[in-house]
From Swiss-Prot:
It comes from Mus musculus (Mouse). GO terms for cellular component: mitochondrion; TIM22 mitochondrial import inner membrane insertion complex. It is found in: Mitochondrion inner membrane. Keywords: Disulfide bond, Membrane, Mitochondrion, Mitochondrion inner membrane, Protein transport, Translocation, Transmembrane, Transmembrane helix, Transport. Belongs to the Tim17/Tim22/Tim23 family. This is Mitochondrial import inner membrane translocase subunit Tim22. One of its GO terms (biological process) is protein insertion into mitochondrial inner membrane.
Length: 194
């Protein structure tokens, strides 16, 4: 069966025969972007990538748990605790007044007193960093969930909320300054990282 060439002045669909219905673009658009659109499972193999098996229910459950606001807050709390503890020990290590007794300024502090002071400062910094990290992370996740977008505004809003909540312990003015300062810092960090 040889294909016949279309007549001069005729189009290819007409040459193929009148048995085929013309393509209705409005109907096609309904299935692609309209009301009849259905979610598609995009397999990496069909897109030119390495094919992978479908995810099991356990994998989906673990992904949902790791993407939850509670998990992100706990992760930021633990990370803040470790980072704050290291920062506190570092600052205590370079401070010349560690273990210093104001009652007896000429006495050299013992290693036990210096280590005790370093541990106290490290624990204090660790707790503060953990609280700030958990507050900021949880607030940012909740703002992102509420807005439905992931952009720089989320970190600015959550920075303002976190800074304001921390600052309001010292008064309204301190809360406003904390809100503005933490929001500006969050915006600068987000601008630098993105």
């Amino acid at each position: 069966m040889a294909a016949t060439a279309p007549k001069a002045g005729g189009s290819a669909p007409e040459a193929a025969g009148s048995a085929e219905a013309p393509l209705q673009y409005s109907l096609l658009l309904q299935y692609l972007v309209g009301d009849k659109r259905q979610p598609r499972l995009l397999e990496p193999g069909s897109l030119g990538g390495i094919p992978s098996p479908a995810k099991s229910e356990e994998q989906k459950m673990i992904e949902r748990a790791m993407e939850s606001c509670a998990f992100k807050a706990v992760l930021a709390c633990v990370g803040g605790f470790v980072l704050g503890g290291a920062f506190g020990i570092f600052t205590a290590g370079i401070d010349t007044n560690v273990g210093f007794d104001p009652k007896d300024p000429y006495r050299t502090p013992t290693a036990k007193e210096v280590l005790k002071d370093m541990g106290q400062r490290g624990m204090s910094y660790a707790k503060n960093f953990a609280i700030v990290g958990a507050m900021f992370s949880c607030t940012e996740c909740l703002v992102e969930s509420y807005r439905g977008k992931s952009d720089w505004k989320n970190s600015v809003i959550s920075g303002c909320i976190t800074g304001g909540a921390i600052g309001f312990r010292a008064g309204v003015k301190a809360g406003a300054i904390g809100c503005g300062g933490f929001a500006a810092f969050s915006a600068a960090i987000d601008y630098y990282l993105r």
